[in-house]
């Protein structure tokens, strides 16, 4: 396999399913590719002296893929290499703190952040504020999104385990100025079986709103109903709830982006939500798993973001508010 054009070192912050999936996909396709996953301190013993982890990725009807992935501890002072290409794949509510923890290593003059979080529209606003405070004035924020379904199983002593539950697509937003560079980066991801493509920034913005709609519907409802995406459609009140949530997102999104009226129409958002469900029928959603593990959820960055923007615009969002408060009630018991 020919090497991709983009060969700059990549650092990945976020050792959950998507971050490890990205790292494993690239390293299994290109075993010597210069990347590293940054882990928090409590993973130090697992990483050990070898500074590598082993990841096993299982996919439907395919042989498992194994990869050795370089690993670093975020606050390890011996890791002094400058970070120029950062993939941020943490939980949305962890993103800002994660970036702040590595500010001394960020290249202030030439920093590219690939934002691959749920709730990235919300995260983007907060991230730009915090980077400005640290005098990183002109970072490239590359908005990314993926519909791949991936779940992380409990690790054993020797390796991490991932299961790909649905084959999706990955998109990366690019401007006229950086289209060629992002196209080369997307080629790397595509050759690593991530089904990746660089698209114009305006198209990416619409796609992020469509992904937000899918997350605002599927995440809280699968968590509340305790079921997979596929089983969700069999619940009697699913269609009515879905339509109300989507209508509110459409109202807010089109008010904020009048040039995207067609892409953010209720029918367009509904079609996208249904596509995501079909691509990930067996996926239980990250919010379902967070509730199951009694962990904090991303509800504030998803439905909460829609509610806050609606309040600013004078648009009521009762369906999103109902889901938001139901999830909050569940997590308040933890």
Locate the predicted segments by residue.
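Active-site-proximal catalytic alpha-helix in oxidoreductases
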Residues: 204-233, 237-250
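Rossmann-like NAD(P)(H) cofactor-binding subdomain of soluble oxidoreductases
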Residues: 62-161
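Rossmann-fold dinucleotide-binding core
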Residues: 120-211
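NAD(P)+-binding Rossmann beta1-loop-alpha1 motif at the extreme N-terminus of oxidoreductases
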Residues: 2-72, 85
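A structural micro-motif
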Residues: 8, 33, 111-112, 139-140, ...
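A structural signal for isolated positions on well-ordered beta-strands in alpha/beta enzyme cores
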Residues: 11, 34-36, 112-114, 142, ...
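Helix-loop-beta segment of a Rossmann-like dinucleotide-binding subdomain
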Residues: 107, 159-171, 223-234, 284-293
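NAD(P)-dependent Rossmann-like dehydrogenase/reductase catalytic/cofactor-binding core
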Residues: 2, 6-7, 240-334
């Amino acid at each position: 396999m020919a090497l991709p054009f983009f060969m700059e070192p990549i650092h990945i912050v976020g050792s959950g399913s998507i971050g490890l999936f990205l790292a494993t996909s690239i390293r299994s396709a290109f075993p010597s590719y210069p990347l590293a996953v940054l882990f928090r301190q409590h993973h130090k013993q697992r990483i050990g002296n070898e500074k590598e982890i082993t990841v096993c990725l299982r996919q439907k009807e395919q042989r498992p893929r194994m990869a050795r992935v370089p690993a670093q501890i975020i606050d390890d002072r011996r890791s002094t290499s400058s970070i120029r290409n950062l993939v941020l794949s943490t939980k949305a509510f962890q993103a800002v703190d994660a970036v702040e923890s590595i500010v001394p290593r960020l290249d202030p003059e030439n920093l590219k952040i690939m934002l691959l979080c749920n709730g990235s529209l919300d995260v983007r606003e907060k991230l730009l504020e915090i980077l400005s405070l640290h005098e990183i004035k002109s970072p490239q924020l590359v908005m990314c999104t993926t519909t791949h379904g991936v779940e992380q199983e409990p690790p054993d002593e020797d390796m991490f385990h991932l299961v790909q539950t649905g084959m999706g697509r990955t998109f990366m937003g690019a401007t006229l100025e950086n289209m060629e560079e992002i196209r080369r980066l997307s080629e790397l991801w595509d050759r690593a079986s991530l089904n990746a493509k660089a698209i114009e920034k305006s198209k990416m913005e619409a796609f992020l709103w469509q992904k937000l709609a899918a997350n605002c519907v599927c995440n809280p409802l699968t968590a509340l109903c305790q079921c997979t995406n596929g089983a969700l459609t069999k619940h009697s009140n699913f269609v009515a709830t879905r339509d109300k949530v989507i209508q509110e997102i459409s109202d807010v999104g089109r008010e904020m982006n009048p040039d995207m009226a067609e892409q953010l129409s209720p029918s367009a958002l509904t079609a996208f939500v249904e596509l995501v469900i079909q691509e990930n029928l067996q996926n239980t959603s990250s919010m379902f798993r967070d509730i199951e593990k009694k962990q904090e959820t991303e509800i504030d960055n998803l439905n909460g973001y829609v509610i806050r923007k609606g309040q600013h615009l004078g648009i009521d969002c009762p369906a999103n508010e109902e889901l938001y408060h139901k999830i909050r009630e569940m997590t308040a018991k933890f």
